[in-house]
Amino acid sequence: TEFFTGRIDFPVQPSLGVKEAMAARVVPHQRQLEWQKLEMTAFIHFTVNTFTGLEWGTGKESPAIFNPTSLDAGQWVRVLSEAGMKMVIITAKHHDGFCLWPTKTTTHSVASSPWKNGQGDVIRELKDSCEANGMKFGVYLSPWDRNASCYGDSPAYNRFYIEQLTELLTWYGKVDEVWF
């Protein structure tokens, strides 16, 4: 019996039965197996709307309301590790557009908040805590941004978004997983 990894090259005009038989013999790549072995990943949604009580923000929230009094990313990671999580993904930016890192692309970020006098970086703290505790690290970067004035202008917004993604993927070392 032939097994397939990667892609399947179907014969010209195969029957549904042939497609099903071939698809049933697809086996995962090593990287896919490693991802499956993680078993549980934590997804942290912590943003400016943690302080508004809303699920989704409007993008008009003042960064001044983002002022956690005892944020301890190390404690988060220790608890998640004790619970069996092997990776944590954080919402670096949700639909409200508020960035948990001091991005150069917008003032709608931790750099404009009173938290740590605008010098805080939730992404850095969490990434460093993950490294210290042997946990994998990932980010979610919302494609929708209700704060960005260029949203809706595809070329301009694409440049804006790619710059944010580039910051996240170059400022923090290895990022194990990215969600959009």
Question: Which residues does each predicted region cover?
Answer:
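Mature catalytic domains of secreted/periplasmic carbohydrate-active enzymes
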Residues: 1-180
